[in-house]
Amino acid sequence: MDTEALANYLLRQLSLDAEENKLEDLLQRQNEDQESSQEYNKKLLLACGFQAILRKILLDARTRATAEGLREVYPYHIEAATQAFLDSQ
């Protein structure tokens, strides 16, 4: 094998190694993105659950205020609704 053929062979091998490294980097980034996505989904699920709890409490507080003939919800309505929610769990 002459020098030029050897140089071409080595360049091809280096190019293949670079492509393999690019592929490995791409796969690693995809795995990191999937992990980040899973963490985001967990946080989103917790936020949705928290929002549902707050909505339930606020609707109960509004019902309590309406039962008293009031148009506004006062802090004691929210406190009573929160306590009722906690007691039901």
Swiss-Prot record:
It comes from the Eukaryota. It is found in: Nucleus; Chromosome, Centromere, Kinetochore. GO terms for biological process: chromosome segregation. One of its GO terms (molecular function) is centromeric DNA binding. Its main location: nucleus. GO terms for cellular component: kinetochore; nucleus. Keywords: Centromere, Chromosome, Kinetochore, Nucleus. Component of the kinetochore, a multiprotein complex that assembles on centromeric DNA and attaches chromosomes to spindle microtubules, mediating chromosome segregation and sister chromatid segregation during meiosis and mitosis. Component of the inner kinetochore constitutive centromere-associated network (CCAN), which serves as a structural platform for outer kinetochore assembly. Belongs to the CENP-W/WIP1 family. Component of the inner kinetochore constitutive centromere-associated network (CCAN) (also known as central kinetochore CTF19 complex in yeast), which is composed of at least AME1, CHL4, CNN1, CTF3, CTF19, IML3, MCM16, MCM21, MCM22, MHF1, MHF2, MIF2, NKP1, NKP2, OKP1 and WIP1. This is Inner kinetochore subunit WIP1.
